[in-house]
C-alpha cells in the first residue's frame, strides 16, 4: 500500500476513516491507527450534527457551535452503498433524542434526511440524490 492506493486486502483496516469521493475513489488516512489520526478523520457521527459539507471534503458549521462542543456530521452526508462498495452498518451511540440507532450506506436515500441536510451533502451524495429522483 502507498499513499495513493489502498489494496483491497487493506481496505477493511482503513475504511472506517475514509471519505467516499466517487464510487471507486476514497480519501483515507495514511495510517489507520486511531491514535495517529488527525483533522477531519477524527470527526464523529451524530444524528443531530453541527456540521455538514461544502464540496467534497470541506466541513462547515450548519449552526453556531458552542465552545467545547464536539464537532460532528451525519455520515449520511458522505457514505453510500453502491454495487461493489458497501459501507458497514454501524450502531449509533450519539445519544440524541432523534437518534436513528443504526447508520447505513443507504441513509442518504431517506427523504427526511435529504430535506434536513439540503446543501450540506458531499457532491458525490448530492449527485446520487439527483440521479435517484
Stretches found by the model and what they are:
Residues 1-52:
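Catalytic cores of histone-lysine modification enzymes
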Residues 45-133:
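C-terminal SET catalytic tail plus cysteine-rich post-SET Zn-binding segment of SAM-dependent SET-domain
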